[in-house]
Regions:
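Residue-level detector of intrinsically disordered terminal segments
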Residues: 12, 16-17, 342
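Bacterial N-terminal signal peptides that target proteins for export
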Residues: 1-13
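Bacterial signal peptide processing site
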Residues: 24-26
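C-terminal motif of bacterial Sec signal peptides marking the signal peptidase cleavage site
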Residues: 20-22
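Helical cap/lid subdomain of alpha/beta-hydrolase-fold lipid enzymes
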Residues: 209-421
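Mature extracellular/luminal domains of secreted and GPI-anchored eukaryotic proteins, especially small
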Residues: 28-96
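N-terminal non-catalytic accessory region
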Residues: 88-241, 384-403, 407-421
C-alpha cells in the first residue's frame, strides 16, 4: 500500500532533501558512513546493519544520507522499507521510480492438489510469507493455498511431525489425497525429511510410503541443501571474525532475543543451526534420500550488497543458474530495472560469510546458489533471503529488477498444475 503525500508536502520534502545533500560539509568517507548509519538507526527507529563503506557507492551513500534527514526522515519513521534501498523507499513512500513487473502474469490453471507453504527457521515478521503471495496464488492462479507454520529454531526431526499433522489436516479439510509442498529455507530440509524412507517414517517405524504417498511434489526456495557457512560461524565452528559480532548481527536480522548466551546455552537453537551447517550437510544428504513418486525441484535466490554489479560475480551467476535442461535460468532478471537486487542491509554482514570471503560467489545473503540446488533445478530469482517471502514494506515489484515475488509463486504453482500436480 502506497503512502499518500500531498503534492505541496512532497515538493517541500524533495527541496529539503536536495538542499541538505548539497550543503553537507566535506568529511572523510568512513566518518560519513558512520554518521549516515547512526542517522538511519534514529530515523527508522530500528537498528540497521553496519554499512560496508568500501562497497557502498557514493550515489547510494548520497541517497541514504538524504533519506535519513529532515522531513524525509519523518516520512520514513515506522514505514521504512526493510531492505534499506533508497529506490524502494522512493517508490513506496513517494511513488517515484516504480517499475512494471517483468514476471509473467499467472495463468489461471489450478493445481490438482492443494499447495502448502512451509516456513523456514524463523517465524518473525520478516520471515513470514506475505499475504500478497497467498492472495495472488489464489485469486490470479486459482490455487488452493494453505500455510504450515512450524516451530521456529527446531530441527527437521521436530518440525517434520508438525508438518505431517498439518498435511493430515489439509487432506481431511479438502478431501485431496496429496499435497504440493513449497518450502522456504530450513523448511526445505523439513519437507525432505518428512517423505524420506530414512526420515519420519523410520522414526515412527512405519512403511516409507506412508508419508511419501501424501506428497505430490516438493519445491524448495532458498534452501541450503549443502549448508550455509553462516550457521557454522554462529556456532563457532568456522573462524570468521568476531563471533559475538556475528551473533549480534543475526539478532538484528531475526528480530529475536538472540545473544551469545542463548546460542551457547539453548540446545534447540544449536541443534537447528547445526542442521544448516556445511559440516552437517553431507551426512544429512547421505541419509535423507529422496522418496519414490515425489517430484523434487528447487529455486535459488541471489542478491548483491547495495545492488553492486561485478563481472566476476555475474559470470559465476550465469554458470550456476543454468537449469537442468540447459536454459539460462535467469529469465526473471533481464528487465526494466536493469540491475541487481539491493540486498537487505540486515543481510549484508552475512553475504561475505556465506560466500567464504569470495565476492564472486552468488548468494541470497544466507544460502549460496550452489547450495540451494536439489532435484530438478529451475533457476535463480533476483531476491535476497527475505524478499523470497515478500515483504509488506517493499514495493510489489522490485524497482531494480522488475521481479514480482507474488507472481513468481503463482507461476511455480501453475507449473505444477501443467505437470498434472
Amino acid at each position: 500500500m502506497r503512502a499518500l503525500i500531498h503534492p505541496q508536502s512532497l515538493s517541500v520534502m524533495l527541496f529539503v532533501m536536495i538542499s541538505l545533500g548539497a550543503c553537507a560539509p566535506t568529511e572523510a568517507r568512513e566518518d560519513r558512513c558512520a554518521r549516515v548509519e547512526s542517522q538511519l538507526d534514529a530515523c527508522a527507529g530500528t537498528p540497521f546493519a553496519r554499512l560496508d563503506c568500501s562497497a557502498t557507492s557514493t550515489a547510494d551513500l548520497d541517497h541514504l544520507d538524504d533519506l535519513s534527514q529532515g522531513i524525509a526522515c519523518q516520512a520514513l519513521q515506522g514505514v521504512a522499507p526493510t531492505d534499506g534501498d533508497p529506490m524502494s523507499a522512493a517508490c513506496r513512500l513517494l511513488g517515484i521510480g516504480c517499475v512494471a513487473s517483468i514476471t509473467p502474469a499467472p495463468k489461471r490453471t489450478p493445481t490438482r492438489y492443494p499447495v502448502l507453504l512451509v516456513n523456514g527457521i524463523d517465524t518473525s515478521p520478516l520471515f513470514r510469507y506475505s499475504p500478497r503471495i497467498v492472495s495472488t496464488m489464489h485469486e490470479a492462479g486459482g490455487h488452493r493455498v494453505l500455510l504450515a507454520t512450524l516451530t521456529p529454531y527446531e530441527t527437521p526431526q521436530v518440525r517434520a511431525p508438525e508438518l505431517w499433522k498439518r498435511i493430515e489436516e489439509v487432506r481431511k479439510e479438502t478431501g485431496a489425497p496429496r499435497v504440493n509442498l513449497i518450502c522456504h529455507s530450513l523448511g526445505g530440509l523439513d519437507c525432505r525429511y518428512l517423505v524420506s524412507p530414512n526420515g519420519l517414517a523410520a522414526d515412527r517405524g512405519v512403511a516409507p510410503e506412508t508419508m511419501a504417498s501424501a506428497v505430490a511434489s516438493i519445491t524448495t526456495i532458498g534452501t541450503a541443501h549443502r549448508g550455509t557457512r553462516v550457521a557454522d560461524v554462529l556456532l563457532g565452528l568456522a573462524p570468521d571474525g568476531d563471533h559475538g559480532r556475528v551473533v549480534n548481527d543475526f539478532a538484528t536480522l531475526a528480530g529475536d532475543a538472540f545473544s551469545a548466551h542463548r546460542i551457547d546455552g539453548d540446545v534447540h537453537v544449536r541443534a537447528a543451526l547445526r542442521t544448516l551447517t556445511v559440516a552437517a550437510a553431507p551426512a544429512f544428504n547421505a541419509s535423507i534420500t529422496d522418496a519414490d513418486g515425489v517430484l523434487y525441484q528447487s529455486w535459488a535466490g541471489y542478491s548483491r550488497p547495495f545492488g553492486a554489479a561485478s563481472a566476476a560475480h555475474d559470470a559465476q551467476l550465469a554458470k550456476l543458474c543454468t537449469t537442468a535442461d540447459g536454459a539460462t535460468g535467469l529469465a526473471y532478471v533481464a528487465g526494466s530495472g536493469g540491475g541487481h537486487d539491493f540486498m537487505a542491509l540486515a543481510l549484508v554482514p552475512f553475504a561475505n560469510i556465506a560466500a567464504a570471503g569470495d565476492a564472486s560467489v552468488p548468494s541470497d545473503g544466507l544460502a549460496t546458489v550452489a547450495s540451494a540446488k536439489w532435484g530438478t533445478f529451475k533457476g535463480c530469482v533476483p531476491a535476497d533471503h527475505m524478499e523470497q517471502l515478500g515483504q509488506h514494506s517493499l514495493p510489489d515489484v522490485n524497482v531494480r529488477t522488475g521481479f514480482d515475488v507474488a507472481r513468481f509463486y503463482a507461476n511455480v504453482a501453475g507449473d505444477l498444475a501443467e505437470q498434472g500436480l
